[in-house]
Regions:
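Repetitive, compositionally biased segments used for assembly/scaffolding
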Residues: 1-130
Length: 130
């Protein structure tokens, strides 16, 4: 499957995302004025935003126009984060696997979609799609 990499760029103060060929495909940067995380494509066009919603104790995701796209919420009972679409349907879950030292991503049916693993040598997170 396709592999992706994310790495923090100190010079630009942002997290950058690369495809398996090493090409920049986008980046995320914190906007302190609006107190949110903003995601951009490689050309600098805003794609989406993430912002903590204290009323519902979750992270809301909105498109570039401000329309609700979904949210992420912590499920302490199952010790995982859950991602939902704007209608409240679960899209995927993310859970830490202590044995393999990685974040595993599962679809709404419980099938593993891939995982994030820290690459010590390159100081980055690698995503391996299943």
């Amino acid at each position: 499957g396709q592999n992706y990499t994310q790495k923090y760029n100190k010079l630009y103060d942002r997290t950058e995302f690369y495809n398996s060929y090493g090409n920049l495909i986008g980046y995320a940067k914190h906007n302190s004025l609006y107190n949110r995380l903003e995601y951009y494509d490689a050309n600098g066009n805003l794609l989406k935003t993430e912002q903590y919603n204290s009323l519902y104790d979750r992270k809301d995701t909105k498109d570039k126009y401000g329309n609700q796209q979904g949210y992420e919420k912590r499920n302490d009972l199952y010790n995982r984060n859950e991602e939902y679409d704007s209608y409240g349907n679960m899209k995927y879950t993310k859970k830490w696997n202590d044995l393999y030292k990685r974040y595993e991503i599962f679809d709404s049916y419980g099938n593993m979609a891939g995982y994030y693993k820290w690459n010590e040598l390159y100081e980055r997170w690698d995503f391996i799609e299943q």
